[in-house]
Every structure is written in C-alpha cells, then in structure tokens.
C-alpha cells in the first residue's frame, strides 16, 4: 500500500475532521481519481507522434493510455471527426496513490523555475487541475529517448464539496501551493 494512502487514513482524516467539524469519517473529502491527458495535435500529420506520446504516458502512469478522438470536424486545423488527437489515463486506487506520491515528492519539484503551484486552479467543486509543460519532469522518462517535449494536463478529482475543502485536503498532503 502506498505511504501517502496510509498517511491519508492516519493523519489527514483526523486533521480535516477537526478543521471542518465533520460528524462522520465518510464526510471527509478524499482523492477519487487522477486523470492525465496529453493532447498531440501534430498527430494528424504523423501517427508515430501519438504512439510516442502514449509510450511516455504509459511509462510514468504505469497504465496503458486510452486514445482520444476528435469530437468535431475543424477545417482550419485539418481535423475530422474521429481522428485520434491525444491520449489519456484515469488512475484510481493503488496506482493513483503511487502516482500522487511521485507527483508531489519527485516530479513537481523538478519543474523548471518552480515557485509553487497556483491555488486558484480549483473548479468550484474541489477538483484541482494543473498543466505540466514538459513530460521530462518524471524520472521514468529517459531524456535521451524523447523525440519531442510535450506537456500534459493533470486533474485531481476529489469528493470535496467546495474549493476550500479541496484546498485543505491537498494542503494536508503538503501539496506545493504558491504562497
């Protein structure tokens, strides 16, 4: 079991129960899933780029990515409906906790010119979204084998009812918010 999951059950739940005066342990917000999305717009011209992006995503998520397809026809981007234009992974359970731990402790501190993550990236329902400009912040990616530096979107979905609860949940994990 991931250390962060044990830390959540032992420490974070108690802290949030006293902070928000919850009556039951089930009211305490928890991390439900983490979604990683990598859009590869250049995949229209070269399908190999999508395969390389999927391989990178599989390397640091430790799960096979799902190919995402275009929903609409967009003439100026030369995209037709159904074209594969990206890949995504939804992490839950043990893999989610392992990835979350690696994200906080290893990957985020390796971001170039890192000064903390914005605390304003909540969606109004306690879910947090962030963008990463380079996939090479993850140690599983071999820098010499990278054909192109790509970014990705990371969405942390929680059961929190408000942004305040979501922020308190992530802050309890020592999430590196900007001060």
From Swiss-Prot:
Question: Sites of the modification N6-acetyllysine?
Answer: 3
- Entry's SUPFAM superfamilies? RL5-like
Annotated keywords: Acetylation, Ribonucleoprotein, Ribosomal protein, RNA-binding, rRNA-binding, tRNA-binding
Pfam families per UniProt? Ribosomal_L5, Ribosomal_L5_C
Q: Which GO terms describe its molecular function?
A: rRNA binding; structural constituent of ribosome; tRNA binding
GO cellular component terms, alphabetically, are: ribonucleoprotein complex; ribosome
**Alphabetical GO biological process terms:** translation
Reply yes or no: does the keyword Ribonucleoprotein apply: yes
The keyword rRNA-binding belongs to this UniProt entry's keyword annotation = yes
Q: Which InterPro entries match?
A: Ribosomal_uL5 (IPR002132), Ribosomal_uL5_bac-type (IPR020930), Ribosomal_uL5_C (IPR031309), Ribosomal_uL5_dom_sf (IPR022803), Ribosomal_uL5_N (IPR031310)
As for what it does, the entry says: This is one of the proteins that bind and probably mediate the attachment of the 5S RNA into the large ribosomal subunit, where it forms part of the central protuberance. In the 70S ribosome it contacts protein S13 of the 30S subunit (bridge B1b), connecting the 2 subunits; this bridge is implicated in subunit movement. Contacts the P site tRNA; the 5S rRNA and some of its associated proteins might help stabilize positioning of ribosome-bound tRNAs.
Q: Which family does it belong to?
A: Belongs to the universal ribosomal protein uL5 family.
Kindly state the subunit structure of this protein.
Answer: Part of the 50S ribosomal subunit; part of the 5S rRNA/L5/L18/L25 subcomplex. Contacts the 5S rRNA and the P site tRNA. Forms a bridge to the 30S subunit in the 70S ribosome.
- What's the protein here called? Large ribosomal subunit protein uL5
Biological source species: Shigella flexneri
């Amino acid at each position: 079991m991931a250390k962060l999951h044990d830390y959540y059950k032992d420490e974070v739940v108690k802290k949030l129960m006293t902070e928000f005066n919850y009556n039951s342990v089930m009211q305490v917000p928890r991390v439900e899933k983490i979604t990683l999305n990598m859009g590869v717009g250049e995949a229209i011209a070269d399908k190999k780029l999508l395969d390389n992006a999927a391989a990178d995503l599989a390397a640091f998520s430790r799960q096979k990515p799902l190919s995402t397809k275009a929903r609409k026809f967009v003439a100026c981007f030369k995209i037709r409906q159904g074209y594969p234009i990206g890949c995504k992974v939804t992490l839950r359970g043990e893999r989610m906790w392992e990835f979350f731990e690696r994200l906080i402790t290893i990957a985020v501190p390796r971001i170039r010119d890192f000064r903390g993550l914005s605390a304003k990236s909540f969606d109004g329902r306690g879910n947090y979204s962030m963008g990463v400009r380079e996939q090479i912040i993850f140690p599983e990616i071999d820098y010499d084998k990278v054909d192109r530096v790509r970014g990705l979107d990371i969405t942390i979905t929680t059961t929190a009812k408000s942004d305040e609860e979501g922020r308190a949940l992530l802050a309890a994990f020592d999430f590196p918010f900007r001060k």
